């Protein structure tokens, strides 16, 4: 079992790096404002039709464009969900959503969280799934990538005030990165057996002679961008454990690769644009070390079996509760870490049924900000915040003004960095406390004791960090939970983007200083260790007390 797990991890990472390297080169061209070959004419026509000037923006203008697009998308999606019974492509005549569920769902998909307090096949029409959720899957992913484009330019430009044009970046990211790759993945999913149709639900006779209603729909097209954009919201309630979404072991492997390929490619792109590929490799080493350790811990915990079943005398040599027999324990463990290290949240197993330690690792990966590869764009700009913090700590230790890529990190940048890092922990801890203090919060818990608290802590951690996965024992479709989680998702997304863009605006105006004998190298194993230590230290200091009340207490009980 150990050899199989090791081979699975190594194979996954090797294939990932092979795919991400050329994609990173293409992203580097876009960051450097170099059109991809053969796209100039199409872009010129589109820019003219859409009225995009192409003039570069300062950080406030860039941020305003990103926020404006997302707020417009939020309003459109909210009213679309409220009135879906008036809209076409609704063969099951599904009614509109309640105001609180519509608000929660709209915020969820606009913020790239894709938390779902509903069952897709019984709640949403084909039109809502396609024109509403799938569109936001593209736009939210493009928004995250555009923000990291701006931040990378801030590190590599000197004495400037502009960070690029947000509309140009969003169009290029959507047209030349997300759309073509998602199309290829969708076609592959269809070939493997995923659904893609507009048929009414089909009534079939099972082998036992009973009648069953099989849901239909345009699944493959949504599934592709759901994984590629690290969105995670499933067409069906069972998400990627449903055979209509994820029909084979091969599609499952491709889904895991799709989650990580853009975050990995962005690290390569960062190294290329910075003119020092070692900087990108340093980030990948730090992410990979944490990732491999976390996968190993989850695999170890799940192959030990469920101690509660063992205590009852049941056969539990491995913990198969809540897992697809098609995939097994090792693949389910790898998928769980992939989906929570990134801001994806898609699942092929029920995280609520993992062992105490097996469920704690995905929860902790979200709580540290999903900086281990992370979401498209958001993972890298989250890790860059920890890079700045690590540089600052190192500067204090050696008595020098901290600098990164030749740019001095001053008080303003550190205040903004601290603010951005503290946004999500504050939301998680205060949100969990509020839920536990109120009857409306506690009544949603399926389980009592430490595991019930873990369900609450996981839900708020998932929402605040824009992941979207859940310990499904929590009955979250209530006005209290829909509003609480919507607030956490909204502030967790834009409360980080705003200070990140402010940091970019500050850094882009600075000159790069040449390296000297006293400059801290930020590309070697020493800095990789310092960066990992910073991530672990912040995560440990912030969340160990809360984790001790949940999964740790459950493990020890």
Curated annotation (Swiss-Prot):
Keyword Heme applies: no
Protein name: Potassium-transporting ATPase potassium-binding subunit
Organism listed in the record: Escherichia fergusonii (strain ATCC 35469 / DSM 13698 / CCUG 18766 / IAM 14443 / JCM 21226 / LMG 7866 / NBRC 102419 / NCTC 12128 / CDC 0568-73)
Transmembrane feature ranges: 5-25, 63-83, 132-152, 170-190, 253-273, 283-303, 329-349, 356-376, 379-399, 416-436, 484-504, 526-546
GO CC annotation terms, alphabetical: plasma membrane
Alphabetical keyword list: Cell inner membrane, Cell membrane, Ion transport, Membrane, Potassium, Potassium transport, Transmembrane, Transmembrane helix, Transport
Record note on quaternary structure: The system is composed of three essential subunits: KdpA, KdpB and KdpC.
Localization, UniProt: Cell inner membrane
Role, per record: Part of the high-affinity ATP-driven potassium transport (or Kdp) system, which catalyzes the hydrolysis of ATP coupled with the electrogenic transport of potassium into the cytoplasm. This subunit binds the periplasmic potassium ions and delivers the ions to the membrane domain of KdpB through an intramembrane tunnel.
Disulfide bond recorded as keyword: no
GO molecular function: P-type potassium transmembrane transporter activity; potassium ion binding
